[in-house]
């Protein structure tokens, strides 16, 4: 499971202005914050809006953006200046892969270290849509039988048992924490043991929320390498990329499929 909220794309005007600095071609720019009537929108691209204003990329700037984009990363520095903010809720196993993209990204996350005991654990806190279990409507053979041969345990049951254990550790942690605040020395000495139970039992399917900042160049690298990934979360992320303003800059054909040509500004 991956959920994206509060997307905001900024920096178009500055990126376009900087894109034209090398050849001092600012006079050729035809993008601006303004309202464009429907009859006049042909060739223009709506990139951003704020209150009653809209930022439209004109055909001159769009053409230059495409040519610079196709000329390679040395020429398309403007893509690093188009900044994207978003909130992502995703499982820890996906965040481990996202964290390989260190350059050009910043993230503030909900802290499992500080806030792991802030609320009771529930099944909705985990990405478990692929786990077998009759409760999920899956008619599967049991994976494990109990030693008595009476009950059957499905993968979803293992997660349920883990959640029960996490909540028991949370209950004891909060109890010992309260006693420690009142000066109980035994509680002070042992409260962290129950915190460790939660930290080390927490499955990688646990969903974490982060506020992320990245840019169009980073998204181009992600899209190229992850759009056919086996994780559903990457498919959701790449679908979101395709819905961004002027996403052709990100999702366009591979540079190796485009013949290099002289860039005219």
What does each model-found stretch correspond to?
Residues 1-263:
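Family-specific signature for flavin-dependent thymidylate synthase
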């Amino acid at each position: 499971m991956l959920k994206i909220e509060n997307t905001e794309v900024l920096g178009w005007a500055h990126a376009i202005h900087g894109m034209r600095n090398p050849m001092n071609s600012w006079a050729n720019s035809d993008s601006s914050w303004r309202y464009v009537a429907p009859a006049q929108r042909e060739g223009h691209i709506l990139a951003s809006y704020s209150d009653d204003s809209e930022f439209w990329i004109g055909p001159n700037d769009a053409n230059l953006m495409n040519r610079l984009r196709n000329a390679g990363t040395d020429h398309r520095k403007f893509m690093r200046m188009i900044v994207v903010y978003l909130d992502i809720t995703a499982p820890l196993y996906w965040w481990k892969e996202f964290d390989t993209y260190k350059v050009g990204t910043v993230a503030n996350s909900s802290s499992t270290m500080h806030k792991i005991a802030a609320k009771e654990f529930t099944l909705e806190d985990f990405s478990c849509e692929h786990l077998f279990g009759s409760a999920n409507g899956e008619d599967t053979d049991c994976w494990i039988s109990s030693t008595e041969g009476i009950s059957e345990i499905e993968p979803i049951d293992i997660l349920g048992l883990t959640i029960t254990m996490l909540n028991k550790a949370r209950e004891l942690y909060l109890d010992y924490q309260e006693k420690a605040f009142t000066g109980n020395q035994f509680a002070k000495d042992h409260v962290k043991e129950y915190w460790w139970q939660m930290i080390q039992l927490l499955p990688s399917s646990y969903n974490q929320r982060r506020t992320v900042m990245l840019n169009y160049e980073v998204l181009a690298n992600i899209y190229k390498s992850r759009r056919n990934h086996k994780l559903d979360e990457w498919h959701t992320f790449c679908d979101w990329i395709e819905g961004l303003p002027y996403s052709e800059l990100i999702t366009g054909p591979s540079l190796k499929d485009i013949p290099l040509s002289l860039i005219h500004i």
